[in-house]
Amino acid sequence: MAAVLTFRRLLTLPRAARGFGVQVSPSGEKITHTGQVYDEKDYRRVRFVDRQKEVNENFAIDLIAQQPVNEVEHRIIACDGGGGALGHPKVYINLDKETKTGTCGYCGLQFKQHHH
């Protein structure tokens, strides 16, 4: 739940102020999506001695933030992440208030009720 609240808080920031994307530590090492970065003298850096640390630069939070809010007609929406083996358990999201945007706790997709 804390991740959803953090995600919502980040989405309210102006695009220039968001901290999305690959960041680099003071030592020049890329920081992963989990914030993993090692000190210069950390023994765990031995696995990157003769090779570069590979970090996927397409963080999921960046990709979800680019998705537009889905406008739906119903008051309650069911999200299953696309269904099948690639989806997630079905969750139901209430969209009762006019200004409310419902966010799926699994995949981060946002839904808003289209009022006539």
UniProtKB/Swiss-Prot annotation:
GO cellular component terms, A-Z: mitochondrial inner membrane; mitochondrion; respiratory chain complex I
Cellular localisation: Mitochondrion inner membrane
Protein name, per record: NADH dehydrogenase [ubiquinone] iron-sulfur protein 6, mitochondrial
Superkingdom of origin organism: Eukaryota
Primary location group: mitochondrion
Entry-linked InterPro entries: NDUFS6, Znf_CHCC
Residues with N6-acetyllysine modification: K90, K112
Recorded family membership: Belongs to the complex I NDUFS6 subunit family.
Subunit structure, as described in the record: Mammalian complex I is composed of 45 different subunits. This is a component of the iron-sulfur (IP) fragment of the enzyme.
Gene symbol of the encoding locus: Ndufs6
Key words of the record: Acetylation, Electron transport, Membrane, Mitochondrion, Mitochondrion inner membrane, Respiratory chain, Transit peptide, Transport
Secretion signal span: none
